[in-house]
Amino acid sequence: MSASRERKKRMQDGNTPAAAPQKKKKKLSEGWLLAICVVLVVALVFGGIFGFRAYQRSRTVLTVGSHEVKVPEFNFFYNNTVGSFKNYASYVGIDTATALDKQNVTTNAVTYLPIFGVDTSYLADYQANDEGIYEDVTWAQLMASATKDVIVQTYAVYNEAVAAGYTLDEDDIAEIDSEMASIESVAVAQGETVDELFARVFGNGCDAEGYRNYMVVVHTAAHYPTTLKYTDEEISARYEESKEDFDVVSFYLYTTKASDYAAENEDGTKADPTEADAAKAKADAESMANDFRAANDAVTVCADYTKASITSSYGEEAATWLFETAALDGEQVKLFEKDDTYYVIKLAAKGDYQSYNALELFIKNDSEEVAEGEMTAERKIAAINASMKADHTEENMKAMIKTYGNGSNGVVENMMRNSMAGVDKSVFAWGLEKHKAGDFSSFITDNGTMYLFITGEGDTRLNVSVSNTLSNEWINSINEAASASCGYDEDAAMAANVGLVLGTN
């Protein structure tokens, strides 16, 4: 029988004990009173601290649609923003040994920030002092504002994806699971739980569940726009709006200028070019124009350039010639002069073209001595060459990628000429030729050896370009609406883990 039921039974039986005689109360000593007061004060202080921290973690930094971004989630995005900016710290004068919330933004930094993709409109409401320092703006504030922009765009797209019923595929989920497993193994190796690791790295309130949700949101926002499809009518209508934004040409370029021939001063600097130097530069350019050699090491490739980009770099005359006069079955080479520089241009391709779907494998040159037991780049290349010579199939190419591709699946969709030119001039030249599924080639570049296996035709460059533009315009429109109503709370953002030190994060 329970104690309460036993007490109840005794009361019901009338067997309740008699009231105990009252005892005289003892007065507590002053020492005990002081000790109790100290305990109460400590409890109040620490209880207040923990309560305050809990309140800070629960604050809403911004809202996108119906989703409220709390401080812990903001920490994940903020940490990524800061991490991606780490390599640019020296350019903008950030001290990598000092917390970001202890350093102020400078006007010198503002000059470089747009180059690194950082919007400086946040600074419009602030004034720098005579020394070029924004006394009221720390790097933490600017980074937090940049993070806000990333979150708004991410969730604007994510919300649309959810509304459309889009979900990540098995490969995307597997990638997220793999990353989570890797992080957990790090935590175990360091003798802590995975939630403890997240809290330590990202801030209080951050845990494994929150990080996984963050990864799902980011991956969804990144992949969903690529699934958007546009009709031929939509693509045609957008192309007609501004053809000049989509029409492109590709060409080889040889550049020379008078300063290339200027003498060297005793201190090692270049002397000012003379008229004789200018004459040599012009003669050199004329020689190349008369006998253009694309294989010349000084010749570069400019692939998929619009008329506006050519005008900006090489002059309006060059742009007009390339788009209106130059032809593969006619005039292909011409010399132009702009700003004391001579440009010899040879047309390589013009108009729309079919892209390729391919499998790609790149074996990077060894930059240092290879560790014992690891294969050298030379051995990898020899093994791949021998295997592909014996078995010239797509399945074997996939096997080579699985063995030597460092985790990449090697799949490339809609490979364009500009991406080929970015690898090497020889890859670009190969891409100009007509290829079919099963065609395979290797290319030795300055950085390593590249293998390409064509799996089929992709979409036309024009369709891809216009579709990307339509997608970007859609993203910008929903982003603008979401940004206007996000209700960004900078005070709440500053309650996040914003005091990171670039040298240790």
Predicted segments with their positions:
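Secretory-pathway/luminal and periplasmic proteins that interact with or process carbohydrate-rich
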Residues: S182-E192, A298-T300, G407-E413
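Short helix/turn-capping signatures at newly exposed starts of structured segments
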Residues: T167-E170, R293-T300
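A short alpha-helix/helix-coil micro-patch that ends at or immediately precedes a cysteine
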Residues: V152-A164, A289, R293, I381-H392
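Short, well-ordered alpha-helical segments enriched in acidic and aromatic residues
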Residues: N296-Y305, E395-G407
